[in-house]
């Protein structure tokens, strides 16, 4: 297995035929992120069983010691069913990892991966043409006391020693559509409320009360249903759970994103894909970071919905108490917004430039708060693009990102709907943790 790694300080390293271990001098942080293609992971797990009878779980543990959770990203056409951690369907790839390592929380991300045509080392395929470019993101921590628990729709793994938990919650809206409506809540609002109550109940029970980063996949996020846009329904359900669980709605809130999976609706208007929420949380709190170029999301005016989004622009986490580790920076989904207004309507490249300016502003603010300094070149990016069929546009976005962050930029591109219908691109990022890519 050929592995390209970057340490927590952003320095490139090379590892060949070696496990992606979270220990040793390369890891200056409590976390490591590994991005691995589906084909490479299948070869790693399958090859192990054929060469000496090693089980898939043993092969996975040897290659990814300290794995605390994973996301299955970009499997095109994952459709109707996703129960717990296992995705099903003709094109679903979740079972590869779910079957081999059933104890590992696995979050489904129902978004097609896009590959810019000129990316060095990437498959030269046209985005949207149906090629299989699915992959996994695996989070590792430096812990050997990991414990896994499955509780209905919630699957989580945690370490008492590291004070960390990774969890995945997958809920089908159809289950909430069948329930009697209360306070005129739409099924998505009720599902979101339920998901976040599960999340907060878990964190309080583990005495790891601080969510660091939350990822939300919301089907048909821009669709108007039940008298309101579905993103606004999601925000209402999320904030309702924050209030019910006595969580602050402003200031010290987690980094987060909410992106829309692109899929069909049933005849009853219910998405065929689930609401999926996955998260990293800790016993120690993170430092919330805002962007001086933007109004804080939790202070957005009512024109964006009766309930404001509940997230910080970024969160900087320094690890377990007394660990003396470098800060990990989680940057929320960031877009072409100045103040609270969308700018550069209809121009995706101008929106990309504005988004990069916002990311740079977040890094500057993080440095002012004592975290970093980080540069754009230090970041690992995830880029969500609304138009997944325009190969030339995707290549131009990739060129802009490389111009801003350097030729060796680490970026994963996904086809997704963005939370505002006039936003054409959203970029999230992280830094301060080691990164490895297996392709």
Question: Where are each of the predicted segments found?
Answer:
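N-terminal presequence-like segments and the immediate start of the first folded domain
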Residues: 2-439
């Amino acid at each position: 297995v050929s592995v390209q790694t970057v340490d927590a300080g952003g320095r490139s390293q090379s590892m060949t035929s070696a496990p992606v271990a979270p220990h040793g001098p390369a890891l200056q942080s409590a976390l490591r992120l590994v991005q691995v293609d589906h084909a490479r992971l299948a070869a790693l797990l399958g090859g192990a069983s054929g060469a000496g009878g090693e089980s898939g779980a043993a092969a996975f543990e040897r290659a990814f010691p300290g794995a605390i959770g994973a996301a299955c990203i970009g499997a095109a056409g994952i459709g109707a069913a996703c129960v717990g951690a296992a995705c099903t369907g003709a094109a679903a790839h979740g079972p590869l990892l779910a079957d081999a390592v059933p104890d590992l929380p696995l979050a489904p991300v129902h978004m097609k991966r896009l590959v810019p045509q000129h990316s060095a080392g990437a498959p030269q395929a046209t985005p949207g043409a149906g090629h299989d470019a699915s992959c996994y993101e695996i989070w590792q921590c430096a812990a050997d006391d990991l414990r896994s628990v499955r509780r209905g729709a919630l699957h989580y793994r945690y370490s008492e020693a590291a004070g960390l938990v990774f969890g995945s919650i997958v809920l089908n809206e159809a289950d909430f559509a069948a329930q009697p409506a209360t306070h005129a809540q739409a099924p998505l609002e009720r599902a979101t409320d339920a998901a976040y109550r599960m999340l907060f109940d878990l964190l309080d029970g583990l005495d790891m009360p601080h969510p660091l980063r939350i990822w939300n996949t919301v089907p048909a996020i821009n669709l108007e249903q039940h008298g309101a846009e579905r993103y606004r329904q999601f925000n209402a359900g999320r904030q309702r759970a924050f209030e019910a669980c006595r969580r602050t709605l402003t200031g010290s809130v987690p980094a987060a994103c909410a992106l829309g999976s692109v899929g069909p609706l049933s005849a009853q208007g219910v998405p065929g894909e689930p609401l999926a929420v996955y998260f990293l949380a800790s016993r120690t709190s993170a430092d919330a970071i805002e962007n001086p170029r933007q109004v804080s999301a939790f202070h957005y005016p009512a024109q964006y919905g009766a309930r404001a989004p509940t997230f910080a622009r970024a969160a900087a986490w320094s690890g377990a108490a007394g660990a003396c580790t470098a800060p990990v920076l989680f940057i929320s989904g960031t877009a072409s917004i100045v103040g609270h207004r969308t700018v550069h309507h209809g121009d995706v490249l101008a929106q990309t430039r504005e988004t990069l300016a916002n990311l740079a502003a977040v890094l500057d603010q993080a440095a002012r708060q004592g975290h970093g300094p980080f540069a754009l070149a230090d970041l690992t990016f995830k880029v969500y693009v609304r138009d997944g069929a325009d190969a030339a546009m995707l290549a131009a976005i990739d060129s802009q990102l490389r111009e801003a962050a350097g030729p060796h930029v680490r970026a994963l591109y996904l086809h997704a709907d963005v939370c505002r219908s006039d936003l054409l691109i959203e970029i999230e990022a992280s830094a301060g943790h080691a990164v490895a890519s297996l392709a």
